[in-house]
Amino acid sequence: ELSFLGRIHSVDDVSRAYDAARSAGFANINLDFIFGLPNQSPPVWAATLEKAIALAPEHLSLYSLIVEPETPLFHWVETGRVPAPDDDLAGELYETAMERLADAGYVQYEVSNWGKKGLGTGDWRLGRPLSDPQSPVPCHHNLLYWRNQEYIGVGPGAHSHMRLPFEHPTATPSAEGAGLRWSNRKPVPGYIKRVQAGEAVVDFWEEIDSRTAMGETMMLGLRLVKEGVSRARFRRRHGVEMDAIFADELARLYSQGMLQSDGESVRLTERGLMLGNQVFAAFLP
């Protein structure tokens, strides 16, 4: 499977790298996996999960395969060399992972992410000790994305996101209160050349209007399956009530059994978790 995905490492390489990281003193390790490969064997996937659990990492990220354009896999699927990924098979493998990881003491706190139970923090942003032994250790870095917060990327290919208004030459009145995102040039030689010449390294930027920003808050926040999207946080972020903007979308998704609400926040149901892309798409312009 690793070779099929174009990875140059082996399963043994993973184990050796993991052991080396532990020996070096790392106490918080994540392992990434991709599932939903064409014709992927459920028993082989189950064995992969067992190997991951046996290593006992603090965090696991499991991503469903996406066939990206301009990749060898895309060409193979287009030419019929390999079949397209099967959504039903991917769903079966996903359910297997959810059940087995829960049994092994991992808490699913995001659509694709699990943390070992009891290693989280009371306030993930402040790093305060936890009193709840059921809380997982999260990926602090990605929480910024899922909460639609600001971040600055440095270096080739790095992405950044800032809210407006702020002092930036591209800011316009129409973008006020929303945001701006940009990315740097990817090839390292070209990036270095621009820096040495005193030229801008930004290759792409776009203003995010208020409606798009609100939709992204919903789309990203709903990925946090335990936390969801807080109505109070939405109000603070955008200056309006969530239900005033997305009344129709919320009503439809409630009726379809995709979303649930406790009055303070909106979260995915089990059905919504399995059909997350349909839910997320409902909030984008």
Feature locations, PLM:
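Minor-groove-contacting beta-hairpin "wing" of winged helix-turn-helix DNA-binding domains
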Residues: 265-269
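Structural preference for long, well-ordered alpha-helical segments in enzyme cores
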Residues: 215-218, 249, 279
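Short amphipathic alpha-helical interaction segments
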Residues: 239-254
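A short, conserved structural fragment
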Residues: 254-264
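Short, amphipathic alpha-helical interaction segments positioned at domain boundaries
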Residues: 271-285
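C-terminal scaffold of the Radical SAM
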Residues: 1-240
